[in-house]
Amino acid sequence: MENTQDFSPPHMDASRPSLGFPLGTALLLIIIFSLSGIFSCCYHWDKHRSLRRSLANGRPSADIESNPYKPKPPFPEMKKPQNLSVPVLMPGDNTPKFIALPCPCAPPRPEKLTVDVQTPPQSPPVKPARFPVPLY
C-alpha cells in the first residue's frame, strides 16, 4: 500500500505563449498609444511643419494653431458691418403666415400704467338641499 503522488509541474504546451497577463496588457497599451501618436502627427502635419520652420528661422511663432496657408481677404478695409438682425418666418399651416422683422427701437411706453381689478360682489353660500336617505 504505497501512496506515491506525482508532485512534478503539469506538462506545458510549447506552442502556448509564456507572456503573463500584466506584461501582455502593458505591451498592448504601448502599441495602442504609439499608433494613436503616429496618427495624430499625420493629422496635424501642417502645424508641425510650420512649427519646425519657425524654430529654424529663430523666431517662435505667436500662434501655433493658425494655418499659414489660409488666404487673407483681398480687401479687409472694405468690410461692411454685419447686420445683427434677421427676419424670422412664422409658421403657418402650409405656408408662412407672417414675417417678423426686428424693431429698430423700443416702442414708446406710457409712464404710468394703472390696472383696476374689479371683483364681483360676494353672495352668501348656498346650502345644499336636504334629501331623506333610507337606511336599509
UniProtKB/Swiss-Prot annotation:
Indicate where this protein resides in the cell: Membrane
Asked if the Swiss-Prot or TrEMBL record annotates the protein with the keyword Transmembrane helix, the reply is yes
Q: Give the chief site where it resides.
A: membrane
Tree of life domain: Eukaryota
Q: TM segments?
A: 19-39
Claim: Transmembrane helix is one of the keywords in the record: yes
Keyword vocabulary terms for this entry:
Membrane, Transmembrane, Transmembrane helix
Q: Which GO terms describe its cellular component?
A: membrane
Q: Where is this region: Disordered?
A: 54-87, 112-136
Membrane topology is:
Single-pass membrane protein
The family database entries (PANTHER family) matched by this protein are listed as:
HYDROXYPROLINE-RICH GLYCOPROTEIN FAMILY PROTEIN
Q: What is this protein called?
A: Uncharacterized protein At5g65660
What lineage is on file?
Answer: Eukaryota, Viridiplantae, Streptophyta, Embryophyta, Tracheophyta
